[in-house]
Amino acid sequence: MSTIAENIAKVAARIREAAQAAGRDPATVGLLAVSKTKPAAAVREAHAAGLRDFGENYLQEALGKQAELADLPLNWHFIGPIQSNKTRPIAEHFQWVHSVDRLKIAQRLSEQRPAGLPPLNVCLQVNVSGEASKSGCAPEDLPALAEAVKQLPNLRLRGLMAIPEPTAERAAQHAAFARLRELLLDLNLGLDTLSMGMSDDLEAAIGEGATWVRIGTALFGARDYGAPAS
């Protein structure tokens, strides 16, 4: 068994244990492998071990990997900040976008989604920690944004995403994820997705209702931050 396959098995066990501890069916928690800065060969290895969903932050890097891996049935999720001039290739080449935080971006994604493709699954990114350096809409702006995005014809609004302020305190982790869950429930729009939790806090996220956990380091090892950030 490869190192990546071993890591996938370990993370799957963590997900299973966390879901069971929360009284949830482990099948309701999706494992999104964050493959940013990792080579296509690592994605291919993860696919061979059973993964199908991969998250990317950097558009040009992602498009290169997608071309290399076109022979595989993969679902690609864009999870990084979105610039207006990058929306067309995102709309054309991804199945999910987790990081929509303003209406202009959502409108462009809807307008640029090719007619032959199903609606693009989107999550709205919320800045639950109030950090000035973090992307995401403010919680008080979320209801209006969600109502507007839900009307766009080529998008399917699925739920919310957050990247809370990193903390080793389990209570603080739970509080941030609970906040996102409450925001989703308050919208009362029948949405089904909470994209939250990473390698160090997936247990707390699952305890508060995560349906996608975004895992990079625990699967692929430490990231190569020298990779191109375009």
From Swiss-Prot:
<comment type="function">
    <text>Perhaps involved in proline biosynthesis.</text>
</comment>
<keyword id="KW-0663">Pyridoxal phosphate</keyword>
<dbReference type="InterPro" id="IPR001608">
    <property type="entry name" value="Ala_racemase_N"/>
</dbReference>
<dbReference type="GO" id="GO:0005737">
    <property type="term" value="C:cytoplasm"/>
</dbReference>
<dbReference type="InterPro" id="IPR011078">
    <property type="entry name" value="PyrdxlP_homeostasis"/>
</dbReference>
<feature type="modified residue" description="N6-(pyridoxal phosphate)lysine">
    <location>
        <position position="36"/>
    </location>
</feature>
<comment type="similarity">
    <text>Belongs to the pyridoxal phosphate-binding protein YggS/PROSC family.</text>
</comment>
<protein>
    <recommendedName>
        <fullName>Pyridoxal phosphate homeostasis protein</fullName>
    </recommendedName>
</protein>
<dbReference type="Pfam" id="PF01168">
    <property type="entry name" value="Ala_racemase_N"/>
</dbReference>
<comment type="function">
    <text>Pyridoxal 5'-phosphate (PLP)-binding protein, which is involved in PLP homeostasis.</text>
</comment>
<dbReference type="GO" id="GO:0030170">
    <property type="term" value="F:pyridoxal phosphate binding"/>
</dbReference>
<dbReference type="InterPro" id="IPR029066">
    <property type="entry name" value="PLP-binding_barrel"/>
</dbReference>
